[in-house]
Curated annotation (Swiss-Prot):
Bilayer topology: Peripheral membrane protein
Keyword Oxidoreductase annotated: no
Domain of life according to the entry: Bacteria
Name of the protein: Thylakoid-associated protein sll1697
Length: 321
């Protein structure tokens, strides 16, 4: 089976330039119209990690989401944006990162994820609690940010879909599966399989290296990447960064589960990975444990509810941060 990964040098988030780059990126894949049909409800799933570090390249740039939304609308789709941040609401994090003016100009709603229990074909994870909004969407477009990650080495397309696990269920998974990096990586891969994004577009124009996902440093990489196969996308990005896949739990799980593409299966309709090699990508200085103990889960839960139900409403009421 051919697995196409479209790769493009892109240096700018300026609206016109970015829109042109995305058209070029998607054209070999059939354009947005190959993924979105008139009337489709299309979930745009960015990385909305935090509202506390704007400008540090911790989240998918709002310009990327807006440009993709415009292409979806041109194809006749009805885009909406959603995520389940670790702390606070999707709307609150989006507002702090400058999303609202761009989304409002295109009349793009923001949804807060609600959970449902869904069966999988995995022997290890019979059911997963996932976002109803993602599972019920006609089309899911995954919009990850290229970042290092202090627990999982890297966060790319597969890890971004963990944001489709609603609320504090993510913290529970860190407690339940985090003692075994192999099991946690497999859970992330099974989540990605269940969500089954129709298209993944990676924002690597400005990336985040070092002690990510939010305490590292911005780095200009100048890369956009897209594929209908999120596992092929991550495989290729790992190669571009010259990283050992065995050190990345999601990549190791993909290999064990037979999801990594072979060289014969991969095709690159635009740039080839060897033309885009990134030297000296910085990984976290020290990897932190994946597992969360019960006290940390309780603190995290309290912080999440405080931000979502006290701090954010107070900000709306008073107009102050």
């Amino acid at each position: 089976m051919v697995k196409s990964v479209s790769l493009l040098r892109s240096q700018s988030y300026e609206a016109g330039s970015l829109l042109a780059s995305l058209r070029t990126l998607l054209e070999p894949l059939g354009g947005m119209g190959n993924f979105v049909k008139p009337g489709d409800r299309v979930l745009l799933k960015p990385n909305l990690l935090t509202g506390n570090r704007p400008g540090r390249e911790c989240i998918t740039r709002p310009e990327v989401v807006a440009a993709v939304a415009q292409l979806v609308q041109e194809a006749g789709g009805k885009p909406f944006m959603g995520d389940s941040p670790a702390f606070g609401s999707a709307r609150g994090v989006a507002e702090n990162n400058g999303y609202l003016p761009l989304l409002q100009a295109l009349d793009i709603p923001i949804v807060e994820f609600r959970g449902g229990r869904y069966a999988t074909d995995s022997d290890s994870f019979n059911h997963l609690r996932l976002s109803k909004e993602a599972m019920d969407a006609d089309v899911v477009i995954n919009l990850p940010k290229l970042k290092s990650h202090a627990q999982l080495t890297m966060t790319m397309g597969v890890k971004n879909l963990f944001g489709c696990v609603p609320g504090k269920m993510k913290a529970w998974w860190h407690m339940e599966a985090g003692k075994d990096a192999n099991r946690f990586g497999e859970m992330l891969v099974e989540t990605a399989k269940a969500i089954a994004p129709d298209l993944s577009i990676l924002d690597g124009i400005m990336a985040h290296e070092g002690n990510g996902p939010m305490h590292g440093d911005p780095r200009e990489v100048g890369l956009l990447a897209a594929s209908p196969d999120v596992f092929a996308l991550d495989f290729v990005i790992t190669d571009i960064l010259q990283l050992d896949p065995a050190t990345i739990p999601t990549m190791a799980a993909q290999e064990r589960l037979g999801l990594n593409p072979t060289a014969a299966e991969l095709t690159f309709p635009l740039s080839h990975p060897r033309e885009l090699v990134v030297d000296n990508w910085k990984l976290p200085e020290v990897l932190m444990p994946i597992d969360f103990g019960l006290p940390r889960v309780l603190r995290s839960t309290f912080k999440h509810f405080y931000i979502r139900f006290v701090k954010e409403p107070l900000h709306i009421y008073t107009g102050k941060a």
